[in-house]
Amino acid sequence: MKIDILTLFPEMFAGPFSSSILKRAQERGLVEIGLINIRDFSTNKHHTVDDAPYGGGAGMVMGPEALFGAVEHVARKYGSKPGRVVLMCPQGIPFTQAYAADLAREETIVLVCGHYEGIDERVREALVTDEISIGDYVLTGGELPAMVVVDAVARLVPGVLGEALSVMEESFSNGLLEYPHFTRPREFRGLKVPEVLLSGHHEEIRKWRRRQSLLRTLERRPEMLKQAGLTREDREILKELLASLNELDLS
């Protein structure tokens, strides 16, 4: 997979992309990440990319010239238009695990990091295929959201993570929050690992994990249950959990 990031501050990405899973994914040729400085495509001698907004108002707006030039540069590099051109934007669609999985199916994507008050609307109309928000808050620029998107998408590329099962069982991948994890020692400062996890009984462990996953989702993100692919067994467990929680509320 090839990911190109259009940014005014390429140096911001050095740390996150040169360590851990993303570093190994690049070394193995599973993911290629290109950092493109938008200023390199400015058409004026001062390499500025922003200007005052027509109609007045506060702040500056990123103009179309450099952004068009940068996207066209990526198209020339690959010999075709990028699969998706994604703008990091607080007005965008909320970024979810399902959205990450959708982007991971593309061969090439371009992430555009906005700055200032925003970008010229003609860039949106002519180039941008997606607009993504990572939350209902405003950041200084699109660089941090782009890092989040790259991390979430790259780990879904086949081969990047060692075990496909691990990816499938993570929070949100199956519509539920993930179950609790434990490792050695069996007891730490009086806190013990649940006995079922030490039993070696795979079916009982599966049931316990599923129950815990349902409980966490019910307690922390109940709205997710409406979209989760619940089985008949899941629904029975939820009835039991709701009854238990109601008893606690009444006691």
From Swiss-Prot:
Name one process (GO BP) from the record: tRNA N1-guanine methylation
Membrane-crossing residues?
Answer: none
Q: Which reaction does it catalyse?
A: guanosine(37) in tRNA + S-adenosyl-L-methionine = N(1)-methylguanosine(37) in tRNA + S-adenosyl-L-homocysteine + H(+)
Task: List, alphabetically, the GO terms of the cellular component aspect.
Answer: cytosol
Q: Which Pfam families match?
A: tRNA_m1G_MT
Principal EC category = transferase
MF terms in GO: tRNA (guanine(37)-N1)-methyltransferase activity
Main subcellular location of this protein, as a coarse class? cytoplasm
Statement: the UniProt record of this protein carries the keyword Transferase: yes
Residues holding S-adenosyl-L-methionine:
114, 134-139
Gene3D superfamilies in the cross-refs: 3.40.1280.10, tRNA(m1g37)methyltransferase, domain 2
* Enzyme Commission numbers on file: 2.1.1.228
NCBIfam families, alphabetically?
A: PRK00026.1, trmD
Which family would the database say this protein is a member of? Answer: Belongs to the RNA methyltransferase TrmD family.
The free-text function statement in the UniProt record for this protein reads: Specifically methylates guanosine-37 in various tRNAs.
Q: How does it assemble?
A: Homodimer.
Q: What is this protein called?
A: tRNA (guanine-N(1)-)-methyltransferase
Q: Give the source lineage, highest ranks first.
A: Bacteria, Bacillati, Bacillota, Clostridia, Eubacteriales
Gene label: trmD
